């Protein structure tokens, strides 16, 4: 983000990865709405979406494949002397830290109000994912060998680091 950006937060823009539990998308939107309302009350500038998407399984998003809610927010680049905005105001470093602080406190308040419901959704989602009715039930993936043994070993190492079950034949 450049200095003339403001503050970016969820929800992400389309496309959304279709392998993410719908409850996580629901909770992400609830957290984003509460955070937006906190910024609106203070008349702070922010935006959602733009380059922030949840298709690529990396950055703040990877945790959602493990059942956790990933929350991304970023403050524009800031110098210790502040940044002059296009309309002439100066945004100080102190203000940018305040944005991060308010976002964090708002996220904690949302979590406090919704902890039991979030745990229930998490538990129900985990049970479904390993059930015989899951869209992931009875799936097997085969990786055919090639002459590039290093690439195959690297993939195996990464999958095993994530506690995935592998059968070597």
Model-derived features with residue positions:
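Active-site lining segments that contact anionic ligands and/or coordinate catalytic metals
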Residues: 67-70, 136-140, 161
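Long hydrophobic segments that form regular secondary structure
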Residues: 91-94, 107-110, 146-161
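Functional cores that coordinate and move charged inorganic groups
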Residues: 1-93
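Divalent metal-coordination and catalytic microenvironments
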Residues: 73, 104, 159
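Generic recognition of flexible, low-complexity loop/linker segments
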Residues: 58-62, 125-131, 144, 154-155
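Catalytic cores of secreted or luminal carbohydrate-active enzymes
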Residues: 76-78, 82-134
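Conserved small/polar residues in nucleotide/adenosyl-binding loops
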Residues: 167-169
């Amino acid at each position: 983000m450049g200095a003339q950006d403001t503050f970016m937060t969820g929800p992400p823009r389309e496309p959304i990865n279709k392998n993410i539990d719908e409850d996580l998308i629901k909770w992400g939107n609830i957290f984003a709405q509460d955070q937006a309302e906190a910024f609106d009350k203070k008349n702070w500038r922010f935006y959602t979406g733009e380059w922030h998407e949840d298709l690529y399984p990396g950055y703040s998003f990877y945790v959602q494949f493990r059942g956790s809610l990933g929350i991304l927010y970023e403050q524009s680049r800031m110098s210790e002397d502040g940044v002059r905005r296009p309309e002439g105001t100066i945004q100080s470093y102190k203000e940018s830290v305040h944005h991060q602080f308010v976002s964090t406190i708002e996220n904690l308040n949302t979590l406090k109000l919704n902890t039991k419901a979030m745990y229930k959704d998490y538990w129900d989602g985990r049970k479904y994912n390993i059930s015989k009715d899951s869209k992931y039930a009875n799936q097997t993936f085969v990786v055919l060998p090639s002459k590039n043994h290093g690439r195959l070993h690297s993939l195996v190492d990464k999958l095993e680091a994530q506690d995935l079950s592998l059968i070597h034949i």
